C-alpha cells in the first residue's frame, strides 16, 4: 500500500512539473536574442498585439484637404515626455514630442525648439531632427521628434518636463510609406527594453526611417524611439527587426505602454 501511495505522489509531481513548463512559453513573435529567429507563435497573446500593446497607425492622412487651396503648412504638438537618464556615457537629458500635421499640404520639420524644466532649472535647446528632409508628414498624420543631450551636471532620475515649438515647411509628397506591426516589448535587466517587430512598405526603397511613440493607458506619450533598418524593401516582402533600446532606459516601459503609434518613411 505504501509503494502504491508513493507511486501516485510521483505521478502527481510529474504532472505538476509539466504544467509549470507550459506556462513559460515565449511571448515573442520574433526572438530578439536569436537573430530574429521565429519562436512558437501559438503562445502569443490575442489580437491586441505585443504584451497587450495595441498598434495604432500614426499615418491617418486627412481626405478633406482641398487640392486647389493655397499650401498652408502647419503642425500642432499633441504630447511631450522628458527624462534625465543614466546613459552609457553619463547623465543624459531626453525629450520627445508628438505632433500632427494640421495644415493642408505635406510638411517637414525644419527646427525643433525644446524648453525643459529639470528640478526647477530651465534648459533650452534647438535642433534639426534627423533626416528631416526625408521625413515627409501628410495632412492629418502624426509623427514624432526625439532628442538626447549628454550633460554631466544633471542627476539621473531628477523630475523633468518639456514643451516643444516646431517649425515646418511645405514638402513634396512622400514616395514610400513604411509600416511596422507585430511590435513586442520586453523589459530587460539592467534597465533597458527590447523591441521586436516586422517592417513592410508600399513600394521600393533602399533606406528607411521609422518613428515609434509609446503611450500609456490614458493615451499620454511615454517616449519615442526612432531607427533605420538596413534592408532594401520592394513592397512585397517584410523584414523583422530587433532592437535593444539601451538609450531609452524608461523603467518598466513594456509594463507602462498600452499602445504604440508608428510612422515610417522609405526613400
Feature annotation, model-predicted:
Residues 2-22:
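Sec-dependent N-terminal signal peptides of Gram-positive bacterial secreted proteins and lipoproteins
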Residues 17-209, 215-267:
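Membrane engagement elements in two modes
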